[in-house]
Amino acid sequence: MQQICVLGSTGSIGISTLDVLASHPDKFSVYALTANSSIDLLVEQCLKFSPQYAVIRDEALYLPLKQRIESLNCTTEVLAGEQALCDVASAVQVDSVMAAIVGAAGLAPTLAAVEAGKRVLLANKESLVMSGKLFMQAAKAASALVLPIDSEHNAIFQCLPQPYTSLADAGVQKILLTGSGGPFRDTPLADLSAKTPDQACAHPNWSMGRKISVDSATMMNKGLEFIEACWLFDATPEQIEIVVHPQSIIHSMVQYVDGSVLAQMGNPDMRTPIAHCLDWPRRIDSGVASLDFFALQGLDFCRPDYQRFPALALATSAIKSGGTYPVALNAANEVAVALFLEEKIKFTDIAAIIAAVLEDWETCEPDTIAAVKEADAIARKLAYSVAAKFGY
C-alpha cells in the first residue's frame, strides 16, 4: 500500500490525481492533502480520503480550516504554512509525492520531497524552470525518482528506453515536443490584444486551471515545458523541436538516429500520465477512454509561429542564455498572467512585460536555492514596475 502526499490537491492536477486514487483503494492511501486557500474543497477531500494531515499554505486560514474539520468529526490534523508543506512532503511515512502546486510556490515542498529521496510525480514544471541544475543534482544525491506528469514529458519518458542514461546512449536524434497552439492559434494577430481572460482560458482540448490555460494561450506553457525537458532528459535546446499539433492526440515524440519515430498517443486527459506514474513501471486503469482511431478526423502538424507567440521565443532564448534568465522569465510570467486574469493588462502585454524584464536582467549562476529565490523576488518586483508602464 503506497502512502501518497498530494501537494495542491484542490487544483486541476490534484483533483485528477484523487480521481485515480479513488479507483484503486487497494493500492494507495492518502497521507496528506494540501491547498493554498480552497478550504471548502479541501474539507470535502478530507472527508472522502481521511488523510492524516491537511495543510493550508495561507496561515490566515488555519483556524477556519481547523474549526471546519473538527466540527465534522474528521480526524485529519490541520497544519499551515510553507514549512508544513515541506514537512508532509518529506515525511518518513510517505512513499510518493504528487507535486502539483502551480508556480514558484511549489518549489520548496517539491525540493523537500526530492531531498528526502521520495518518488516524486512532478507536475510543477516551475521547479525545474527555476532551479533545474540544483533540482536534478539534489535528486541524484538523494536517489529520488522523478517521474514527469506533464503529458508531453510523460510521453517522452514513455518513448525512451528504460533505464534511461542519455540521449546519445539511447540513439536519440531529437525530441519532438508537441503543443496544440491553444485557443488563439488561428486568431488574427490584430485581434489578440482584445482577448479576455475567459477567452484565453477556453482551451479547445484540455481542462486546466486558469494560470496554465493562459500560459497555453500565449504558448509560454510550451516554453516552460521546453526548459523542463532540457533538464529532465539532459538535452540541449538544439536537441528539442517544438511541433504544433492542434488535435492534442500525440502528446510528444522521440526521433531516433535510425529514422524511427516513437509517439505516445491518447485522449487528452491528465489522468493518463497520472496513472502511468502512480504505479510505474506497472500500468493501472486511469478511467480514461481508449483512443478511437476510426473517429479521428486527422492529425495535423506545423511549426510554431513566433510572431504570434513571442512568449515562446522568450522562453527558448532564456534557457539558451542560462543563469537566472529562466528564473526571471518564470517570475515575470507569473506576475503578468496574474495581472491579466485580474483584467489589469491586455493579453498582448503579457509577453511585452516578460520581454522588458529580461531585457534589463543581470544574470548570474545560482549555486543555492536561496539565490534562486532571491532572483525570483527581484524579477517579480521588476515585473510589477514594468507593468505599471502598461497602465497597471
Curated annotation (Swiss-Prot):
Enzyme class, broadest EC rank: oxidoreductase
UniProt keyword terms in alphabetical order: Isoprene biosynthesis, Manganese, Metal-binding, NADP, Oxidoreductase
Single GO MF annotation: 1-deoxy-D-xylulose-5-phosphate reductoisomerase activity
Residues annotated as binding NADPH: 10-13, 124, 126, 209
Binding-site positions, 1-deoxy-D-xylulose 5-phosphate: 125, 151-152, 180, 203, 216, 221-222, 225
Pfam families: DXP_redisom_C, DXP_reductoisom, DXPR_C
Gene3D superfamilies: 1.10.1740.10, NAD(P)-binding Rossmann-like Domain
Catalysis performed (reactions): 2-C-methyl-D-erythritol 4-phosphate + NADP(+) = 1-deoxy-D-xylulose 5-phosphate + NADPH + H(+)
Pathways per UniProt: Isoprenoid biosynthesis; isopentenyl diphosphate biosynthesis via DXP pathway; isopentenyl diphosphate from 1-deoxy-D-xylulose 5-phosphate: step 1/6
Metal-binding as UniProt keyword: yes
Origin: domain of life: Bacteria
Positions of transmembrane segments: none
Residues reported to bind Mn(2+): 150, 152, 225
Entry function: Catalyzes the NADPH-dependent rearrangement and reduction of 1-deoxy-D-xylulose-5-phosphate (DXP) to 2-C-methyl-D-erythritol 4-phosphate (MEP).
Family: Belongs to the DXR family.
Protein name: 1-deoxy-D-xylulose 5-phosphate reductoisomerase
